């Protein structure tokens, strides 16, 4: 099986997962929307969630969306500057257009195969800067670890500030005990840790023998470069600036969700805490293995908006407005721009060097 065919197959699988979840969410919301129409005495022939969603999208305030896109660019500029700070201890003074462009291309790649962006990002920076892929990947892992910690802080804040609404909503809408029993009874939860621990133990016991093989040497080189990249955080020049960029990144993410409230009439009265809650739930939805969080993002954003009495149909429209403007438009548009732009920039630089 060729690499191209494998990549196409993976892309189709992940898009299939995303569309399946999105269809499930849409189907359930359509049923709920029809029930609402019957209660209001509206003819079911004029009760299409699809038509409502298109009408909501066309009536959205794109002035607010433009500000959201600006916040998106600011967050990624800070991410690129923070990445430069991680690359510098490796002896690399990376150019901003290379790190920024690699990040935008990585977001675009994530729309095809989830989490492939991290690999693409390390490949792109190693192509345009003098750094090994393994070391670049190590810095990206550090970058993502910091993101996970930041998300955990955001989750903690949302839970504390919205505990009352969350608690009431889950009591009324979900049987948590039954859900937990189903999750805990899933066999893979027991099998996966056993396999993982066994693999670690056997690798540790046979490490010296493994290093004597060609495969072992290759693995050691990868792990060593990976480790150097991760450890670069302890040699960051200015920790205060590094933390500042981390705060900017996640503040912009939050602000993007909050400002989208004002682009859509049914959510325009929601406050800062609601923005944090919806942002956190949406972030968890994007983690799901589907392109850009397709389907899972819509479901979790809908659940979060339910805390604040936003109906399912309106919640679905809001999720689509955010998903299309950020996850699709921004990631595709800016990703394609830098796919075209970076080779042109470096071709010009090569010609200038040759001319001199």
Range-by-range predicted roles:
Residues 91-94, 104-119, 230:
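Short intracellular "coupling" helices and adjacent cytoplasmic loop segments at the cytosolic face
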